[in-house]
Amino acid sequence: MRLRCAVLDDFQDVATTLADWTPVQDRTEVVSFTDHFASEDELASALADFDIVVTLRERVPFPASLLDRLPRLKLLIASGMRNSVIDYAAAERNGVTVCGTKSTSTPPVELTWALLLGLARSLVTESNALRSGGPWQSTVGADLHGRRLGLLGLGKIGSKVAQVGLAFGMEVTAWSHHLTKERADEVGVQLASTKDELLATSDFVSLHLVLSDRTRGILGAPELALLRPTAYLVNTSRAGLVDQDALLAALHEGRIAGAGVDVFDVEPLPADHPMRTAPRLLATPHLGYVSGNNYRTYYGHAVEDIEAYLAGAPVRRLGGSRCATRPGRPPASYTPKTRNPTHLENPR
C-alpha cells in the first residue's frame, strides 16, 4: 500500500506542476489542498489518513495538541530550514521525522523593495486614480537618493536590502542586538548606536530580524512614536516583531507617512480584519517567499526528503527529530523539473 502525502495551503495550485513527483509516485499518493484549514479540529480531521505532510513556511502550526491527534503521521516536511511553529519534542515523542528544504533570500529582498518603492511613489494611489478616471498626478513622491534607510537586522536578507539601498544612493544604517561594527563595515553601512537612534533618524525603516522572545514586539507604541511623521515602515519579516494595534493607531492618526506590510498576526487575514482597510498601508498577502524558483526548490526538495526518508536516511532534519526508519542509502541528487504528473489529486 502506498503512503499518503498531503500538501497544505497550495493556494496557487502549483505544487503538482513546479516539481517532478514521479520519483515517489509508485510509493506515495500525493494530495494537494488549495484551501487553508482554519481550525485545529478541521486540520486534524483532514490529515487523519496521511503518513506525510508538506507545509509551507510557518503557515500552519503543529503543536503537541495536533501532533498527538495524527497517529499515522510519520514525516513532516516544512519549507525552509527554520520553523518556530512546530513542537519538535512532540514530533519526536510521536515518532515523526521533521525535515526542511533549502530556499533563497532573493524573493523577500525584492518584495521589500517593491513595498518601499510603492510607498515612496504612491503607486497604488496613482494607479487606482488613473484606472478609475480620477485626478492626474495627485501625489508627490518621496525621494530615495540621499535619504536614510534604517535596517533592523543585517543578516542574509538585510544585507542584500542594504546593497540595493546603497545602489539608490541612500545612506544606510543598521542595528540589532548583536550587530558589530565589523559586520556593518563589511556590508558597507553605518552602525547605529541604538535602536532608538535608528528609528528617530531614518526616513525608511525595514525589519529583517528573526522572531524570538527577545525580538517579539521590538517595535511597540513607544518605538513607533520615535519615527518621523514623514517616515515609512516596511515589515516583510515576521508579524510578531511589530505591535499590530500600535501600528494601526499610528497609521490612523497620521503619525507616520505609511507602512508596507507582508506579514500578519493571523493568516490568511480575515475579511473584516482592520489591516485590510487601514489608511496609509500597502499590504500584501505574505508574498515574500512566493516566487517560481523558491517554490521549485521547496517542492523539489520535498520530493527529495520523501525519497531519503523511504531510503531510511532522512536529510535536512529539523529540531533533532528522530524516528525508526528502514536502513538504506540516501537517494541520488535530485533536480526539480516542471511537469504535471497525472497521478496527483487536488480535492479542494
Q: Language-model segments: which ranges?
A:
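An N-terminal-biased, well-structured beta-alpha scaffold segment characteristic
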Residues: 1-99, 104, 200, 220
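Phosphate-binding beta-alpha-beta segment of Rossmann-like dinucleotide-binding domains, i.e.
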Residues: 94-96, 100-148, 152, 163, ...
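N-terminal Rossmann-fold NAD(P) dinucleotide-binding loop
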Residues: 158-159
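Rossmann-like dinucleotide-binding domain for NAD(H)/NADP(H)
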Residues: 98, 216, 230-348
